[in-house]
Amino acid sequence: MEEYYMKLALDLAKQGEGQTESNPLVGAVVVKDGQIVGMGAHLKYGEAHAEVHAIHMAGAHAEGADIYVTLEPCSHYGKTPPCAELIINSGIKRVFVAMRDPNPLVAGRGISMMKEAGIEVREGILADQAERLNEKFLHFMRTGLPYVTLKAAASLDGKIATSTGDSKWITSEAARQDAQQYRKTHQSILVGVGTVKADNPSLTCRLPNVTKQPVRVILDTVLSIPEDAKVICDQIAPTWIFTTARADEEKKKRLSAFGVNIFTLETERIQIPDVLKILAEEGIMSVYVEGGSAVHGSFVKEGCFQEIIFYFAPKLIGGTHAPSLISGEGFQSMKDVPLLQFTDITQIGRDIKLTAKPTKE
């Protein structure tokens, strides 16, 4: 039954996807005498944590009960008081934790607090599932850098447009709708200025009940972005532009007047590691890279990605000059080519979605 209750807690945690910002997804279930007496999830950044909801629901039944939590209860004061302290004061006798929190502010302290208070703590139940649930948060806490997902849609022969630049639409409506979920679960969407010029996208999540839009990140070496682009004018979501010392200072001022954040790198070209470092400093834990092909090529060349999600349509575009999924310098030797492991292959309508992650095996 321990795995059953933890699985329920994991399912509850998913309710907060796309809404907890820099906080992890957490679910909690309180059980007493074989009966569930409390449940909760962290649903929105700044609001009550999962343990708070579950214990408040349990009320007096929390005394002598067990609680199942998908991540180690916090031990510090942040937007809310520490959950470990709440658990201690509630009279709960046993705590089942899927995994420890690598956040330096927690990192075992929550577990230590509860043990010192005489509470029995068991760890590791469905730890792998808990790890997958919060892979973006955990990657950020362990590396100090955002979790990067590369997304693209292409024909079966790997083309993202015809030789004339026509790309609407390669994949089906079902595939395009599926891709929207990842805009919701990432804190930022990143594209090159070429994509802005070609498609004039809004780069927003169009799913219902989205409480906060992801930050729109544009890579633009010489600040050539059109000033009437949607990402500049619509004010729906924040827009951040990374440029270089080659950018026009007057244009910077005009864009800033629109509320655009300009980050100027002191280099001739935009270096992906520099961009990711700055995004991390700004609190961005996850980046959804939508292209174009040169941008994808830069991320791949630098090894700056944790996951790819590619949609393939059963179409053959052909053409030497039709753009491919990934362009740029590429690799000169096969020994340098990154090896990926497929983690999911799904058919969506007539299209195929491939998900893969880098592996050393």
Swiss-Prot record:
<feature type="binding site">
    <location>
        <position position="206"/>
    </location>
    <ligand>
        <name>substrate</name>
    </ligand>
</feature>
<feature type="domain" description="CMP/dCMP-type deaminase">
    <location>
        <begin position="1"/>
        <end position="122"/>
    </location>
</feature>
<keyword id="KW-0511">Multifunctional enzyme</keyword>
<feature type="binding site">
    <location>
        <position position="83"/>
    </location>
    <ligand>
        <name>Zn(2+)</name>
    </ligand>
</feature>
<keyword id="KW-0686">Riboflavin biosynthesis</keyword>
<dbReference type="InterPro" id="IPR002125">
    <property type="entry name" value="CMP_dCMP_dom"/>
</dbReference>
<comment type="similarity">
    <text>In the C-terminal section; belongs to the HTP reductase family.</text>
</comment>
<feature type="binding site">
    <location>
        <begin position="292"/>
        <end position="298"/>
    </location>
    <ligand>
        <name>NADP(+)</name>
    </ligand>
</feature>
<dbReference type="GO" id="GO:0008703">
    <property type="term" value="F:5-amino-6-(5-phosphoribosylamino)uracil reductase activity"/>
</dbReference>
<dbReference type="Pfam" id="PF00383">
    <property type="entry name" value="dCMP_cyt_deam_1"/>
</dbReference>
<feature type="binding site">
    <location>
        <position position="199"/>
    </location>
    <ligand>
        <name>NADP(+)</name>
    </ligand>
</feature>
<feature type="binding site">
    <location>
        <position position="183"/>
    </location>
    <ligand>
        <name>substrate</name>
    </ligand>
</feature>
<dbReference type="InterPro" id="IPR016192">
    <property type="entry name" value="APOBEC/CMP_deaminase_Zn-bd"/>
</dbReference>
<keyword id="KW-0378">Hydrolase</keyword>
<feature type="binding site">
    <location>
        <position position="195"/>
    </location>
    <ligand>
        <name>NADP(+)</name>
    </ligand>
</feature>
<comment type="subunit">
    <text>Homotetramer.</text>
</comment>
<feature type="region of interest" description="Deaminase">
    <location>
        <begin position="1"/>
        <end position="144"/>
    </location>
</feature>
<keyword id="KW-0479">Metal-binding</keyword>
<keyword id="KW-0521">NADP</keyword>
<dbReference type="InterPro" id="IPR002734">
    <property type="entry name" value="RibDG_C"/>
</dbReference>
<dbReference type="InterPro" id="IPR024072">
    <property type="entry name" value="DHFR-like_dom_sf"/>
</dbReference>
<feature type="binding site">
    <location>
        <position position="221"/>
    </location>
    <ligand>
        <name>NADP(+)</name>
    </ligand>
</feature>
<dbReference type="GO" id="GO:0050661">
    <property type="term" value="F:NADP binding"/>
</dbReference>
<dbReference type="Pfam" id="PF01872">
    <property type="entry name" value="RibD_C"/>
</dbReference>
<feature type="region of interest" description="Reductase">
    <location>
        <begin position="145"/>
        <end position="361"/>
    </location>
</feature>
<comment type="similarity">
    <text>In the N-terminal section; belongs to the cytidine and deoxycytidylate deaminase family.</text>
</comment>
<protein>
    <recommendedName>
        <fullName>Riboflavin biosynthesis protein RibD</fullName>
        <ecNumber>3.5.4.26</ecNumber>
        <ecNumber>1.1.1.193</ecNumber>
    </recommendedName>
</protein>
<feature type="binding site">
    <location>
        <position position="153"/>
    </location>
    <ligand>
        <name>NADP(+)</name>
    </ligand>
</feature>
<feature type="active site" description="Proton donor">
    <location>
        <position position="51"/>
    </location>
</feature>
<dbReference type="InterPro" id="IPR011549">
    <property type="entry name" value="RibD_C"/>
</dbReference>
<feature type="binding site">
    <location>
        <position position="290"/>
    </location>
    <ligand>
        <name>substrate</name>
    </ligand>
</feature>
<dbReference type="GO" id="GO:0008270">
    <property type="term" value="F:zinc ion binding"/>
</dbReference>
<feature type="binding site">
    <location>
        <position position="203"/>
    </location>
    <ligand>
        <name>substrate</name>
    </ligand>
</feature>
<dbReference type="GO" id="GO:0009231">
    <property type="term" value="P:riboflavin biosynthetic process"/>
</dbReference>
<dbReference type="InterPro" id="IPR016193">
    <property type="entry name" value="Cytidine_deaminase-like"/>
</dbReference>
<feature type="binding site">
    <location>
        <position position="49"/>
    </location>
    <ligand>
        <name>Zn(2+)</name>
    </ligand>
</feature>
<dbReference type="InterPro" id="IPR050765">
    <property type="entry name" value="Riboflavin_Biosynth_HTPR"/>
</dbReference>
<feature type="binding site">
    <location>
        <position position="74"/>
    </location>
    <ligand>
        <name>Zn(2+)</name>
    </ligand>
</feature>
<dbReference type="InterPro" id="IPR004794">
    <property type="entry name" value="Eubact_RibD"/>
</dbReference>
<comment type="pathway">
    <text>Cofactor biosynthesis; riboflavin biosynthesis; 5-amino-6-(D-ribitylamino)uracil from GTP: step 2/4.</text>
</comment>
<feature type="binding site">
    <location>
        <position position="167"/>
    </location>
    <ligand>
        <name>substrate</name>
    </ligand>
</feature>
<keyword id="KW-0862">Zinc</keyword>
